[in-house]
Amino acid sequence: MNIQDMILTLQKHWSSQGCVLMQAYDVEKGAGTMSPYTFLRSIGPEPWKVAYVEPSRRPADGRYGENPNRLYQHHQFQVIIKPSPDNIQELYLDSLRALGIDPLEHDIRFVEDNWENPSLGCAGLGWEVWLDGMEITQFTYFQQVGGLECKPVSVEITYGIERLASYIQDKENVFDLEWTSGFTVKDLFMMAEYEHSVYTFETSDVDMLFQLFSTYEKEAIKQMDNGLVHPAYDYVLKCSHTFNLLDAKGAISVTERTGYIARVRNLARKVAKTYYEEREKLGFPMLKGEGSSHE
């Protein structure tokens, strides 16, 4: 099964469980969890079901396209359901069956791996899912998002698309994976992998990136003061990505690193609080099954 068919299969499976199929969010981020479809929607009491593919950029993992297992940008298939259903593990195993992986014929283990994202003030109880010795999925019950306690608890399922495809297609090099008929990962992403690695490690302007971080930080605070959650959160994401670029370049010392992470976390917490307050003003409309002109 190629990657495109894998994605279509997962979309069909989770759509049948009532998930909204969203498209990837158009601001750089290091993980699918950082999308507003997860970060913001996990806050507050309103129910939510979503599934989407998220390209995830991790500048420090760039290897000029020369490493068979490390990528500047990989893809995650993200599922969020709030409140978490009692049969979520069985629904997940059903998704593996849909991909042609029979749990009865494979060694599938849920290995405890509690999760934390310090820069977003997020934490949860969770497991890595191992398939015949390879991690393919992260399974997390959110306890805290943006420093706020999660009531009710959301469950997040994150499939590593390239990793799962490596198993399904029995390929050792990620660039050899078939994306769809006639196209490999190498065809689609090798040039970008190489160029982003050159940019990250060689040609990026450190002074400009430091300036951008401060500019994005100020704008995030300004828009929160205006009660505009989504524009503010976009700038939090931009702060996070800019920090990751600086960190990958080695421009931030160990001592400074803690301070920068704290600055991003403080922004994320303010956004979370503002989002909750704005939804509360609207009367948490999705509790009533109503839409909102502010969506």
Curated annotation (Swiss-Prot):
Which leading EC class covers this enzyme?
Answer: ligase
The record's section on Pfam families has:
tRNA-synt_2e
Q: Name one GO molecular function term.
A: ATP binding
The reaction(s) annotated as catalysed by this protein in its Swiss-Prot or TrEMBL entry are:
tRNA(Gly) + glycine + ATP = glycyl-tRNA(Gly) + AMP + diphosphate
> Which CDD domains does the record cross-reference, listed alphabetically?
GlyRS_alpha_core (cd00733)
Q: Which domain of life is it from?
A: Bacteria
SUPFAM superfamilies documented for this protein: Class II aaRS and biotin synthetases (SSF55681)
Compartments where located: Cytoplasm
By sequence similarity, the record places it as follows: Belongs to the class-II aminoacyl-tRNA synthetase family.
Instruction: Supply the PANTHER family for this chain.
Output: GLYCINE--TRNA LIGASE, CHLOROPLASTIC_MITOCHONDRIAL 2, GLYCYL-TRNA SYNTHETASE
Can you say what this protein is called? Glycine--tRNA ligase alpha subunit
Q: Which organism is it from?
A: Bacillus subtilis (strain 168)
